[in-house]
Amino acid sequence: MNNKMNHPLITVDGRTLMDRPLEPPNFVVDTLLAQGLHILAGSPKVGKSWLALWLAVTVAKGKPVWNMSTKQGTTLYLCLEDSVLRIQNRLFEITEDAPDSVHFCTECALIGQGLEEQVDTFLAAHPDTVLVIIDTLQMVRPVHDATYANDYKDLSVLKRLA
């Protein structure tokens, strides 16, 4: 790749950086989950979807996650490998009362083919949204070519949304 840049590096010296007032990150789960893009990865069938569901419900309720406070707000869980019945069954397993501030969706557009607009529309309708979970990433990718370049491109789109 030949990306010649005709300008010098833009740097900041240590003193200037230390003197610059910067905003701390906003945490959805205090000290654990900051605003932004995160990837939950692990072996198949170890409970990642259960964890995602529990996290969506717990944050929507404003309850602590492992003794860490949460920023209560609307959550959106794109559970793209599940049916509504499966989600309901799992909800009954983890809680007696799911709040109306946790939303579930089993179908959505792909990255670059409408997903960004769908999420933006949801966020506009629910401005207090603090967490969006996509389960699984592969279900929203338009190309099933797992090259680094495609990974980077797709994750960059999601990072801009975050």
Explain the meaning of each model-derived region.
Residues S43:
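P-loop (Walker A) phosphate-binding loop of NTP-binding proteins
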Residues L40:
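Hydrophobic anchor at the beta1->P-loop junction of P-loop NTPases
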Residues T58-G62:
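Active-site catalytic microenvironments for nucleophilic, acid-base chemistry
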Residues V28, A34-Q35:
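Pre-Walker A (P-loop) beta-loop-beta motif of ABC nucleotide-binding domains
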Residues L51, L55:
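Hydrophobic positions on the alpha1 helix immediately C-terminal to the Walker A/P-loop
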Residues M1-K4:
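N-terminal nucleic-acid engagement/recognition segments and initiation subdomains in replication
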Residues N6-L9, R15, L22-P24, V28-V29, ...:
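Conserved inter-motif catalytic segment of the P-loop NTP-binding fold
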